[in-house]
């Protein structure tokens, strides 16, 4: 009966991937257990959806439950199995002819009992070799988890910058079109300024693009180094226990070097170029927008889209709470169906806001979303200390500084243009170009909590 119990516990505490006793055990949705390092490396190398290596059941998420009780079972099981130690593991003290079965915490040297009582080591803390093995093994697991988190963060940054690189040239070309469309409205003498602006934008775009490419290369190399370090730690955790104290010091130094060398993602932000006379020209079409308090539309779907977009910008390991930011919306009292109109909104005290124009019919509906038709909006969302700007139709990020005072909104109904300007900088934020308005428009303002 005792052998049956031993056989049962041994099979339960064996990893099906490495066929060894479980290290930092976890269980997935189907109930099978594996070493956390083995499962992490296996799932990262698999391009198909994450599935159990035993029963092939697909796991819906990467998060697994840690088995707290398993660690207590693995330790005595390891002790009950004869250790195949190298000859150096059973060293005999030359001076006292006794087995070195203690480890000094200070210099991590093997000692016999009499050596541990010598003046050199008497004030130091000592562990039995088996206790020290488990102590250093836990330290290794902590280092492995730290390395894996760094690798995951590096991979997220790499994916984000790869996506930016894929659309960067399109964004630069589109922004050049926006800027070029602004200048024909002003006098001929501004042509020279336009040319300088576009050339500087192209030059700045090339510089940031190269920064992104270099950062992408650094992150890719760091991912390889972190993977190698993680595999080395995994290999060390399976070595003869007596080698752990001597090797851990070098590993800790290398891990600290990798921590200091972790590449930081590039913040691809272009300069805000002043356009001469833009504020004066727009002020010719200034109107004063009042809010219609009688419109009580509740755009829950739009607010939900904003929260999820805000969460997608957060690269922390902690899950984002989509209800953390509360939004309230307001509609302008004026209905605009012709002519040129310009007004300004103070966003100085707002971190999260949505401002622009929407089709008048949306005032009577509650199903407006960020991808709905007939909305021309500029969004500002804050995550930690970073602000991101987006425009709708379609949703597009803008890598330029956010306005920190007054935001200007300009509508040219007949030409199908909606523009947003940074009043303090007299610079263009973005424009909706060559649209056809066949419906009335209303100003729309939405503010979110800080």
Swiss-Prot record:
A Pfam match: SPRY
SMART domains with a match to the protein in the record: BBOX, RING
Zinc finger extent (RING-type): 15-56
Key words, A-Z: Metal-binding, Zinc, Zinc-finger
GO MF assignments: ubiquitin protein ligase activity; zinc ion binding
GO cellular component entries: cytoplasm
InterPro entries (UniProt xref): B30.2/SPRY, B30.2/SPRY_sf, Butyrophylin_SPRY, ConA-like_dom_sf, SPRY_dom, TRIM/RBCC, Znf_B-box, Znf_C3HC4_RING-type
UniProt keyword Repeat present: no
Zinc finger motifs (B box-type), residue ranges: 88-131
BP GO terms, sorted: innate immune response; regulation of gene expression
Family matches, as SUPFAM superfamilies: B-box zinc-binding domain, Concanavalin A-like lectins/glucanases, RING/U-box
Chain sites annotated for binding Zn(2+): 93, 96, 115, 121
Keyword presence, NAD: no
Boundaries of every B30.2/SPRY domain copy: 269-450
Family recorded in the similarity comment: Belongs to the TRIM/RBCC family.
Name of this protein: Tripartite motif-containing protein 77
Organism: Homo sapiens (Human)
Upper classification of the organism: Eukaryota, Metazoa, Chordata, Craniata, Vertebrata
